[in-house]
């Protein structure tokens, strides 16, 4: 039961940090490459 309480207290913190960093990364990508729906990596 103690392990379950530890898991339930750690999981929201880890998921908040993960989604916060992911949102920050997406914001910075959209700031550097605005309106890039398709990255033209494969266009020759």
From Swiss-Prot:
Main location per the UniProt record: plastid
Transmembrane segments: 7-27
Disulfide pattern: none
Species this protein is from: Morus indica (Mulberry)
Gene this chain is encoded by: psaJ
Gene3D superfamilies from the UniProt entry: Single helix bin (1.20.5.510)
Membrane topology: Single-pass membrane protein
Role of this protein: May help in the organization of the PsaE and PsaF subunits.
Name of the protein described by the UniProt record: Photosystem I reaction center subunit IX
Keywords for the protein's UniProt record, in alphabetical order: Chloroplast, Membrane, Photosynthesis, Photosystem I, Plastid, Thylakoid, Transmembrane, Transmembrane helix
GO biological process: photosynthesis
Family to which the UniProt record says this protein belongs: Belongs to the PsaJ family.
GO cellular component, one term: chloroplast thylakoid membrane
Compartments where located: Plastid, Chloroplast thylakoid membrane
SUPFAM superfamilies for this protein: Subunit IX of photosystem I reaction centre, PsaJ
């Amino acid at each position: 039961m103690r392990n379950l309480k530890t898991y339930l207290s750690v999981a929201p913190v880890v998921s908040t940090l993960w989604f916060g960093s992911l949102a920050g990364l997406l914001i910075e990508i959209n700031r550097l490459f605005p309106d890039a729906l398709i990255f033209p990596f494969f266009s020759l």
